[in-house]
Amino acid sequence: MIGIIGAMEEEVTILKNKLTQLSEISVAHVKFYTGILKDREVVITQSGIGKVNAAISTTLLINKFKPDIIINTGSAGALDESLNVGDVLISDDVKYHDADATAFGYEYGQVPQMPVAFQSSKPLIEKVSQVVQQQQLTAKVGLIVSGDSFIGSVEQRQKIKKAFPNAMAVEMEATAIAQTCYQFNVPFVVVRAVSDLANGEAEMSFEAFLEKAAVSSSQTVEALVSQL
């Protein structure tokens, strides 16, 4: 069983509509869609936006469906200036950009008693990298950071880049999903696409290009599923 998590309806609808033998179940107000995608059993959920929603949905998915792996799909804001709208983002590490327990000796972004970063499954990273090469898509593997704010100003962007110079993208759920997978020992990877450049024009760009990002990330996830 492959688990696929997206925060927003636009981020999961394309994949959900491709499921055969579709079945829907609701647990604690979270909807799960099971079915067959590319001859593989999958379960898709729309988690809702933000870290708490993401962690709850991931926990429910793992407990109810016992997935072998989890893929987080959707959109993100680019922090790497070489990235453009529609480019595919593949996580190697994910971190929180809004966690601060440095007063107790932890690194900025590290939750107490948790790793500094949550590492994606290397075999899954390799698989996704092969997929994007086959599809001739522009993609980047790197650090994705998460927090409970939509990054829509130059000041916010600069603050994150100062704390995490190597971060390529920012969004609101991936690290919470990764932490949950870490605690349940479920391999994961984040496969998202750029919807905006996390700057003063981010809100307008996000609204205009969310669909493009959703198509790009969904196509990549579908191709990945076919090779798992």
Swiss-Prot record:
Residues annotated for substrate binding in this entry: G77, I151, M172, E173
NCBIfam families, per the entry: MTA_SAH-Nsdase (TIGR01704), PRK05584.1 (NF004079)
GO terms under cellular component: cytosol
Pathway named in the protein's UniProt entry: Amino-acid biosynthesis; L-methionine biosynthesis via salvage pathway; S-methyl-5-thio-alpha-D-ribose 1-phosphate from S-methyl-5'-thioadenosine (hydrolase route): step 1/2
Protein name from the UniProt record: 5'-methylthioadenosine/S-adenosylhomocysteine nucleosidase
Pfam families: PNP_UDP_1
UniProt entry keywords in alphabetical sequence: Amino-acid biosynthesis, Hydrolase, Methionine biosynthesis
Catalytic activity: S-adenosyl-L-homocysteine + H2O = S-(5-deoxy-D-ribos-5-yl)-L-homocysteine + adenine; S-methyl-5'-thioadenosine + H2O = 5-(methylsulfanyl)-D-ribose + adenine; 5'-deoxyadenosine + H2O = 5-deoxy-D-ribose + adenine
Catalytic residues, chain numbering: E11 (proton acceptor), D196 (proton donor)
EC code: 3.2.2.9
Function in brief: Catalyzes the irreversible cleavage of the glycosidic bond in both 5'-methylthioadenosine (MTA) and S-adenosylhomocysteine (SAH/AdoHcy) to adenine and the corresponding thioribose, 5'-methylthioribose and S-ribosylhomocysteine, respectively. Also cleaves 5'-deoxyadenosine, a toxic by-product of radical S-adenosylmethionine (SAM) enzymes, into 5-deoxyribose and adenine.
GO biological process, one term: nucleoside catabolic process
A GO molecular function held by the record: methylthioadenosine nucleosidase activity
Domain of life: Bacteria
Keyword Amino-acid biosynthesis part of the UniProt annotation: yes
Gene that this polypeptide is encoded by: mtnN
Protein family: Belongs to the PNP/UDP phosphorylase family. MtnN subfamily.
Species annotation: Staphylococcus aureus (strain MRSA252)
